[in-house]
Swiss-Prot record:
Family matches, as SUPFAM superfamilies: (Trans)glycosidases (SSF51445)
Broad class of where this protein is predominantly found: secreted
Protein name: Endochitinase 11
Keyword Glycoprotein: yes
Source organism: Metarhizium anisopliae
Chemical reaction(s) catalysed: Random endo-hydrolysis of N-acetyl-beta-D-glucosaminide (1->4)-beta-linkages in chitin and chitodextrins
Active site: E346 (proton donor)
Gene: chi11
Protein family according to the UniProt entry: Belongs to the glycosyl hydrolase 18 family. Chitinase class V subfamily.
Subcellular location as annotated: Secreted
pH profile of the protein: Optimum pH is 5.0.
Purpose of the protein: Secreted chitinase involved in the degradation of chitin, a component of the cell walls of fungi and exoskeletal elements of some animals (including worms and arthropods). Participates in the infection process and directly acts in the penetration process of the host cuticle.
Amino acid sequence: MLFSMVMFTERWWVGSKDCPRVPALENSNNPWRLERTATAAELSQYGNPTTCEIDNGGVIVADGFQASKGYTGDSIVDYNDAHYKTSVDQDAWGFVRAAYNRGRNTNRQSSGPHPLCTRKCIAWLLMGRLMNAVLTQSDNPALVPNQNATGSNSRPWKPLGKAQSYSNEELNNAPQFNPETLYASDTLIRFNGVNYISQSKEQKVSPSDSNPWRVFVDWTGTKERVGTPKKAWPKHVYAPYVDFTLNTIPDLRALAKNHNVNHFTLAFVVSKDANTTCGTAYGMQNYAQYSKIKALREAGGDVMLSIGGANNAPLAASCKNVDDLMQHYYDIVDNLNLKVLDFDIEGTWVAVQASIERRNLAVKKVQDKWKSEGKDIAIWYTLPILPTGLTPEGMNVLSDAKAKGVELAGVNVMTMDYGNAICQSANTEGQNIHGKCATSAIAFLHSQLKGLHPNKSDAEIDAMMGTTPMVGVNDVQGEVFYLSDARLVMQDAQKRNLGMVGIWSIARDLPAALTCLRNSTA
């Protein structure tokens, strides 16, 4: 990279905030390595950038929502770190996101589990506190080790705070809803014979009114910028990942023309607060790299998009409202003209139950919406794996998806970074150590998916599997994926007729020194 008349190389992944000042040649905390002074030819070709200001791709800056303020139609506000747009004029103390909570624990309850409380149990009362059944009622919610207060572990019970209980007399005599009354938060009312509790300060909003605020991202002109795919997405495909957050990405059309690589997986869309972005640095509306997608599609190729990844937070973690999350997924597919959508669930997020359930609920909702519109959008989940198969956390992601009715086209696994001694492969070119770890992982994955889908044939299970190794030097020290490993993995994929083969990543598919770990070489 050229910056301020100096050539730098990145030592690891860098984001938009990692501006290459003039660092010391050796600094373990600096992602940039100073190489040399730029030549006159390089300065003539690339110019001499001296600032790190970039086009944010259309990121919206909106004022924070104020409940005491009225809004005109088409107003855009920021609320709980997401943008919302109202379709109609709004009075003060009108809608926020949820005006009333219908019957949430408004009936008198005794301590102890509800007799019908199962895996789908909403809540029950324990010693004056509401508890939510995240997984199952079989574990005692009174025991702290079984509680999941922050949603960051896999325990089954989440405390919801102090319960609100009312006598039958209080419920029956609750004041009838009056649109002219300004209700404080947590006020009990009665509307059409049903009790409700206001979730915020409210006026002129009845429990039956439809909320006019909708999650909002400015997609103006995006559909035209990315072009439209000319062909259906293949049932069996090589779709290497493209790190779409890099300042420079490969020419996708040239790769299609010169190497017959026609399909790619773009990574990653993540949340900045609760809004959709490309790697947090770029907005979704007018991203400069969209022209490469359009050129590829005009040449007959196509892309799928991956949401998540190892860095930053996935949308399912930051966007707490399932309907908003569903709308994000719908808008991404609609405005980028996608036929396939991938969810890369890794790192700590593969074990955060709240985001797992929220994602699966939103995917089910958006799939139902697509079906009602006659659209066939394929959904893939990408998960970390060991040579012995998916981890319990990964299996939980898939089990929860099945329980919620999500229909997966496939499960792609990251056959990389195992952290297992048997996969140490530095200086073992030709022994296929890393390749054997990958094929072992796929064999175990087949058994695991067969257990989840016993009615599918072996061929159908193979067709819904994908393998994505990290070419060259992996993040885990001592793990290297060689060309001989690639041949073994491809042979196994062809034998099984896998649904997908990928690599991380196309930008890294270049030679480098054995110990060199970069996002632009392998």
